[in-house]
A protein has these predicted regions:
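Conserved alpha-helical scaffold segments that buttress catalytic/binding sites
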Residues: 2-371
């Protein structure tokens, strides 16, 4: 171990020390596989780890755009062989203003190529810690919300029951109901929900349908998804319809505004969120709407609202929440057609990666015994 001078801060010191402890086994296997399947590089290539055809992480601008360049698993019956299963839910039929979130899974996958599997601050290398597969997208039905819900529920149910950790790429927030439904059916106890958003999303209907403003009304109608275990973080602004606020008040959900969280401190806010979501629950689902961030950071979303969180506040929240296990995560309302320099898709990718990394660091992933 090298010497550290006094100018290192505690986080930087931890990160640098931790990196030295991480294995490189999977990286070496990836290089060897690339040379075997992609052919050794041309004679003029000095670095003999470089193949002729791009395989694996490098270069970041090349390759097939699965999430984090994870293997594409055509046979979804095998998803239980992996620790994490990524699936897209390309649906924006529940949108009440800007559309385009049907392209969210594509946008997130595309920019995820920019990321490596190693997090400096977390001291985690996902490639060395867990296995990830990209299952592709659920076959959604653009003109039929209810059939799409059935498709999404079946897909999430399949992944969750396999033992893989589901990562769902939305899609508008109407998918929150069918994703929760797909998990809840496999639980003997209750399912809590930690919901990041600027909007309450608790109306019964909107525009006469179960739109992206309604998922938690219907999710908390599921017998083992009680409203007392729904905590909604970041709610505020001029886009919180009164019928939804009324439902939350009557059902006893917990709402935490941005100001609430900032004034009490992110650590205390996360502690409260965990207390509510886990109160008597068997498992907790994380539903992350990118519009919980200030609109300056997420222009590519269906209902942008100024006054939201800063990215570092959200990432700190995620780090604390993932100290406890999660049933899965969904990222919703990422609309690439309205994005600027892919920054909305970028933060969506970061939230997923930090969630996985923190779960690994806390010992919650992989979920299954390797014995």
């Amino acid at each position: 171990m090298g010497m550290f001078h006094n100018h290192y801060g505690p986080e930087a010191r931890y990160a640098v020390e931790r990196e030295a402890e991480l294995p490189t086994t999977k990286w070496e296997e990836e290089v060897a596989r690339g040379l075997e399947y992609g052919l050794p590089g041309a004679d003029s290539i000095v670095d003999k780890r470089i193949p002729t055809f791009s395989r694996g992480e490098l270069p970041h601008f090349a390759g097939i755009n699965t999430f984090l360049k994870a293997p594409y698993l055509e046979d979804v019956r095998r998803c239980g062989e992996y620790d994490v299963a990524v699936l897209g839910a390309p649906f924006d039929g529940g949108t009440t203003y800007r559309s385009g979130t049907r392209f969210g899974p594509q946008g997130i996958r595309k920019i995820s190529a920019l990321y490596g599997p190693y997090s400096f601050e977390l001291g985690v290398d996902l490639r060395e810690s867990i296995t990830i597969a990209d299952l592709g997208d659920v076959f959604t039905i653009p003109a039929n919300i209810e059939k799409t819900f059935d498709q999404i529920s079946k897909a999430v149910s399949h992944v969750y029951s396999s033992g893989a950790f589901p990562v769902v790429l939305g899609g508008d927030h109407s998918i929150g109901y069918p994703t929760v439904r797909g998990v809840a059916e496999h639980l003997d106890g209750n399912l809590g929900i930690i919901h990041f958003d600027r909007h309450v999303d608790t109306q019964e209907t909107d525009l006469d349908e179960r739109m992206h403003t309604t998922p938690w009304f219907h999710a908390t109608d599921i017998p083992n998804v009680p409203p007392k275990n729904l905590v909604q973080i970041g709610i505020g602004g001029w886009q919180a319809p009164r019928p939804g606020v009324k439902v939350g008040r009557e059902r006893g959900t917990t709402i935490m505004t941005v100001t609430d969280c900032v004034e009490m401190g992110i650590e205390a806010a996360a502690e409260r969120a965990l207390e509510v979501a886990w109160d008597g629950a068997e498992a907790v689902w994380l539903s992350f709407d990118v519009d919980c961030l200030d609109a300056a950071f997420v222009p590519g979303t269906g209902w942008p609202e100024p006054g939201g969180f800063l990215p570092r506040e959200v990432l700190k929240f995620i780090q604390l929440i993932a100290e406890r296990p999660l049933a899965g995560i969904e990222i919703v309302e990422c609309s690439p057609p309205y994005d600027n320099a892919e920054i909305t898709s970028l933060i969506a990718t970061r939230v997923i990666c930090d969630t996985l990394g923190c779960l690994v660091r806390a010992g919650h992933l992989p979920q299954r015994s390797t014995s």
